């Protein structure tokens, strides 16, 4: 079996080249061809010696994700469904803005955390993605978008690990993928523009601070443990006090001077004025220890299995005002891609359990998505 070169960061690729009897600097050339130019054929790499290209052809390949379908939202958001084998599907979403392009990518097929408000969690957990499967979402999206938009310059400026899965429960594959994103010979993204979102795996937050500190977003969703236990089951293992202490430690290494806290607004559950006041007290208590925060209030995207409802916008505005009046920087997330199930918490689409995955792939391959624009894709020609 040949090696998929998307599985390697630059150091790993250098070791691979040495194993072929080549100098380490060849890895830099190869890395640029793969990630900056989107090459998938060694024959394209004209500045590499023919002998090296022949070695690579016999021992390696560059395999991107298998695209099942592409969905285009009326607001410009694009969602791809990728088949990663054995009935597992993952999704990535591109969100265009006037000043940036953000790609939301997955780290696992499914998710084991099981947050009550997240449809992905209701799908269940299948497996961790490999480094190559994580990186390939960016590799495919960046080079597809350049073709699609007719642009030579970089399209994706921000990456958020907010797709399917808990990134810090796939740590060994996540960190090399982050290094590829950050490497100047790869995508050259700023640490400030790569965000890992976590439900609160405390030991891995500490490791990430040492190994590859990028922007951190924490799914908080409640001001006290009893409520968070019911919404984010991982809280029973890593309660709020431990989580915020880890965030304070992380901030010393973080590329931004604050930690973002995500808060999904659930009608009658966590959106009352007393919840906002409890959050203010909680953050003021930890700010004395050096924690600086920003809150991102997220409108809930309903799905039948949750039994939850979205907070009314006046309620969200009142909640935000309490936080802002206390000096906490607060934003309300604008939902994007709702019409293609690409918004936050919707990245399982219509998957409610593992048995429906095969039916879902088959339906989408046939373009049977009830009015959603579907483009069945082969390779990069989407």
Curated annotation (Swiss-Prot):
Gene3D superfamilies: 1.10.150.530, Aldolase class I
UniProt-listed Enzyme Commission number(s): 2.1.1.192
Sequence ranges assigned to domain Radical SAM core in this UniProt record: 97-339
Subcellular location: Cytoplasm
Catalytic activity: adenosine(2503) in 23S rRNA + 2 reduced [2Fe-2S]-[ferredoxin] + 2 S-adenosyl-L-methionine = 2-methyladenosine(2503) in 23S rRNA + 5'-deoxyadenosine + L-methionine + 2 oxidized [2Fe-2S]-[ferredoxin] + S-adenosyl-L-homocysteine; adenosine(37) in tRNA + 2 reduced [2Fe-2S]-[ferredoxin] + 2 S-adenosyl-L-methionine = 2-methyladenosine(37) in tRNA + 5'-deoxyadenosine + L-methionine + 2 oxidized [2Fe-2S]-[ferredoxin] + S-adenosyl-L-homocysteine
GO MF, one example: tRNA (adenine(37)-C2)-methyltransferase activity
Residues reported in the UniProt entry to bind [4Fe-4S] cluster: 111, 115, 118
PROSITE patterns: RADICAL_SAM (PS51918)
InterPro entries (alphabetical): Aldolase_TIM (IPR013785), Methyltransferase_A (IPR040072), RlmN_N (IPR048641), RNA_MTrfase_RlmN (IPR027492), rRNA_lsu_MTrfase_RlmN/Cfr (IPR004383), rSAM (IPR007197)
UniProtKB keywords: 4Fe-4S, Cytoplasm, Disulfide bond, Iron, Iron-sulfur, Metal-binding, Methyltransferase, rRNA processing, S-adenosyl-L-methionine, Transferase, tRNA processing
CC cofactor note: Binds 1 [4Fe-4S] cluster. The cluster is coordinated with 3 cysteines and an exchangeable S-adenosyl-L-methionine.
Disulfide bonds: 104-344
Positions of S-adenosyl-L-methionine binding: 165-166, 197, 219-221, 301
Gene Ontology biological process: rRNA base methylation; tRNA methylation
Cofactor(s) recorded in Swiss-Prot or TrEMBL: [4Fe-4S] cluster
Residues at the catalytic site: 91, 344
Cited HAMAP family: RNA_methyltr_RlmN
Function of the protein: Specifically methylates position 2 of adenine 2503 in 23S rRNA and position 2 of adenine 37 in tRNAs. m2A2503 modification seems to play a crucial role in the proofreading step occurring at the peptidyl transferase center and thus would serve to optimize ribosomal fidelity.
Sequence similarity: Belongs to the radical SAM superfamily. RlmN family.
Protein name: Dual-specificity RNA methyltransferase RlmN
Organism: Polaromonas sp. (strain JS666 / ATCC BAA-500)
